[in-house]
Each structure stands twice: as structure tokens, then as C-alpha cells.
């Protein structure tokens, strides 16, 4: 039995030794065939596919010849596409840009193989210089490709291009070009990479190049906006607030920061902080209707009804189409009446004051109803109470009917 097992193992070993050279021979033929196709400039996609297939085998990953032929196959496709574009012939623009990016990926893959020391402990760079020189000339097409995909709203592809463009600044094979110091488009590429990540709602991609992107002063406000929204997605409250504050301090008029900063403080019941933001905005633009309306809303929530009325009337003087300002004034009068009405021991004078407040509230809430009919939850009950207290039977019956219909 043992002898039989030994014989079987011996037969398998012999078979393996006989088949191995055949496999290597077939691989050599495949490499040679791909090389001939590249040289002839024909069936380049076939040559590319053949070399990519060989590289899927880990045993071939250090084979410089395979990498080199793959690079040349893609390079020829890129150059043929470029020629067609130059001659104004039909060509797939996306494919041309993708070939550009693939050249960088392949060249850096080959360069990483060349960085592995030989038996003598030395690195032999046969391809780094010619490849880096060629790629340096066409590197702007990585940026152009990124912007092209941005316009097509293909943000994943756009990110890959800008990411590759930026990666060149730290890649060993491009060190001599000193992109990090000399490339004036680096921060702009980083901004567009952040933008693409933001549009994908990919927080990792958004933050990856944010440090470099913040050097792009032309887009600084937008950068802070994308970062703030990314921190919010990550539930990083501290950074979200910090970024909103930085943005508002830097440019109070930029439309993103003011409303969200006020909203944050309001949700956290930090109304004094929210009011301080509104006051700072009004110090810069005292007649801004949105700032005035916002301050009026904060004052209403703080219970400072008289100040709310004063500020909200200023907002309407600037813009009389602000529905919310009518609501704020009406509710401020209404709330004062309700507070006074809570006192069961009312004098005749007090009762008159209450009616006066209800009368003052009524036209503003009626106006708000006209401007915002769908906001019944806000205006119906206050008007119901006003009509009830002022003995306005017809108006009361109409509101009562509305409320009963809603209950059904």
C-alpha cells in the first residue's frame, strides 16, 4: 500500500515537472504575441486584456515585461484616441480620459516593482525616467478628465481622476518634478476631489484631500460648507459647530452658515447664542429682511414679545411678503394676551388690555393665514381663541368647523 502511494506521488511530481515548462512556454508565447500586437498597433485592447489577465496571477506581479507591455498597449490606445480627436474624428472621450488615468496606475504599479531591491540590494529603474517624462507631459489630462466627469455628474469617476492627479505629488517616480511645491493647480484639484466626495456623500473621500483643498482660497467658503455637512453626516457635533462658526466669522453674508448656526443654537436651546449670531449679522447688514425675521423669531422663542414685535415690523418694512414675520407679530400679541388671561382675578382695565392684544394679533394672524393656508396647525388655534374671546360668532363657527374636520 505504501509503495503504491509513493508511486502515485512520484507520477504526479513527474507530471508537474513536465507540465510546468509547457505553462511557461505558453505564457512566453502570450507575452510575445501581445508585444507584436502593440508593435503593429492592432488589437490593442486584446493585448491589454491579455497582460491584465497574466497580472492577476500573483506569480507574475513582479514581471516587468508584462507591466511594460501593458503600459505600451494602453499608451498606444491613448495616442490613437488623441489623434482621432485632433483630426476631429469620432472617438469615445470618456475612454480617452480613462486611458490617461490607467497609464498612471500602470506606470506606478511597474515603478513599485522596480523599487524592490535585487539580490545585490540595489534597485534597477529601467522605466521610471521614460515613463515619468511621458506622464508629466500628459498629467494635465488627469485634471481635465476630472472636470469633464464633474460636468457629466459622474462623481465617482471624477474623484478617481483628481485623486490620481494629487497622488502624483507624493509618488516616488515623480519626485524630481516637485509637484507639491510647484503645481499651482494642486489645491484646486483637491477642492474638486472634495466636491466629488461630497456629492457622493462619501465622508472618507470628502475629507481625504480637505487639508490641501483649504489652500484653495477661491473656494474656501464652499470648502467649509462641504466639511460642515460631512461632519454632520458623521455626527461630529463639535467639528460641525466649529466649522459653522469659522465660516460665519469669515464671511457672515455667505448664505450657508448663518441659518445653520442659528438653527443649531436654537435646537440646543442656546437662544442667547442664537441671538448673538443674529445681532452680529445685523451689525453688518441692518436692513437685511432675513436677519431681521430671524431675530424676531428668536425673540419670540425667548418670550421677549415686545422686542419681537418691534424687530418683526422692521422686517416687514423692508419686505412685506415675509409670511413668517406676520406670524411672529401676531403670535407675540396673542401670547401676551394669553399670559394676562391666565390670571383669574381680572380688573375691567386688564380685560380691556387683553381684548386689545387679541385685536392687535388678529390682522397679522389673518394675513398669515392668507399667505400660508397650508400651515393650519400654526394659525387655526390662535384665531379660534381670538374669535372666541372677542365674541366673533361667524368667524368662530368657520374656524370651529375647520378644526372639527381635521379631527375626523
Where are these regions (language model features)?
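Short coil/linker segments at helix-helix boundaries
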Residues: 73-152, 168-187, 334-364
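Start-of-domain marker
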Residues: 27-93
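TPR alpha-solenoid repeat register
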Residues: 66, 174-178, 189, 222-223, ...
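Structural register within alpha-helical repeat arrays
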Residues: 33, 70, 77, 138, ...
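Residue-level recognition of tetratricopeptide repeat
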Residues: 60-63, 172, 186, 219-220, ...
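Canonical positions in the second alpha-helix
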Residues: 54, 165, 212-213, 246-247, ...
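Structural marker of alpha-solenoid helical repeat scaffolds
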Residues: 57, 168, 216, 250, ...
Amino acid at each position: 500500500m505504501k509503495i503504491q502511494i509513493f508511486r502515485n506521488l512520484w507520477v504526479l511530481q513527474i507530471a508537474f515537472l513536465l507540465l510546468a515548462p509547457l505553462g511557461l512556454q505558453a505564457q512566453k508565447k502570450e507575452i510575445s504575441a501581445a508585444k507584436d500586437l502593440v508593435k503593429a498597433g492592432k488589437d490593442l485592447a486584446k493585448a491589454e486584456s491579455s497582460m491584465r489577465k497574466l497580472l492577476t496571477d500573483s506569480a507574475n506581479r513582479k514581471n516587468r515585461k508584462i507591466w511594460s507591455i501593458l503600459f505600451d498597449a494602453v499608451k498606444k490606445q491613448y495616442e490613437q484616441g488623441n489623434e482621432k480627436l485632433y483630426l476631429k474624428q469620432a472617438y469615445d472621450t470618456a475612454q480617452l480620459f480613462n486611458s490617461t488615468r490607467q497609464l498612471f496606475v500602470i506606470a506606478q504599479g511597474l515603478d513599485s516593482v522596480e523599487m524592490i531591491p535585487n539580490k545585490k540590494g540595489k534597485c534597477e529603474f529601467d522605466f521610471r525616467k521614460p515613463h515619468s517624462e511621458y506622464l508629466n507631459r500628459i498629467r494635465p489630462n488627469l485634471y481635465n478628465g476630472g472636470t469633464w466627469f464633474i460636468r457629466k455628474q459622474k462623481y465617482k469617476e471624477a474623484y478617481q481622476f483628481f485623486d490620481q492627479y494629487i497622488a502624483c505629488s507624493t509618488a516616488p517616480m515623480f519626485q524630481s518634478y516637485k509637484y507639491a511645491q510647484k503645481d499651482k493647480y494642486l489645491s484646486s484639484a483637491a477642492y474638486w476631489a472634495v466636491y466629488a466626495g461630497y456629492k457622493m456623500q462619501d465622508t472618507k473621500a470628502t475629507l481625504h484631500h480637505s487639508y490641501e483643498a483649504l489652500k484653495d482660497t477661491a473656494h474656501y467658503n464652499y470648502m467649509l460648507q462641504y466639511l460642515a455637512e460631512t461632519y454632520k453626516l458623521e455626527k461630529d457635533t463639535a467639528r460641525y459647530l466649529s466649522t459653522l462658526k469659522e465660516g460665519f466669522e469669515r464671511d457672515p453674508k455667505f448664505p450657508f452658515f448663518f441659518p445653520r448656526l442659528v438653527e443649531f443654537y436654537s435646537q440646543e436651546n442656546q437662544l442667547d447664542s442664537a441671538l448673538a449670531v443674529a445681532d452680529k449679522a445685523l451689525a453688518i447688514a441692518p436692513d437685511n429682511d432675513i436677519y431681521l425675521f430671524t431675530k424676531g423669531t428668536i425673540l419670540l422663542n425667548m418670550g421677549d414679545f415686545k422686542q419681537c414685535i418691534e424687530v418683526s415690523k422692521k422686517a416687514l418694512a423692508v419686505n412685506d411678503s415675509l409670511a413668517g414675520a406676520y406670524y411672529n407679530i401676531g403670535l407675540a400679541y396673542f401670547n401676551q394676551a394669553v399670559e394676562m388671561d391666565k390670571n383669574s382675578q381680572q380688573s375691567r382695565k386688564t380685560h380691556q388690555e387683553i381684548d386689545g392684544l387679541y385685536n392687535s394679533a388678529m390682522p397679522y394672524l389673518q394675513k398669515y393665514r392668507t399667505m400660508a393656508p397650508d400651515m393650519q396647525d400654526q394659525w387655526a388655534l390662535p384665531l379660534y381663541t381670538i374669535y372666541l374671546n372677542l365674541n366673533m360668532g361667524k368667524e368662530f363657527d368657520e374656524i370651529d368647523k375647520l378644526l372639527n374636520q381635521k379631527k375626523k
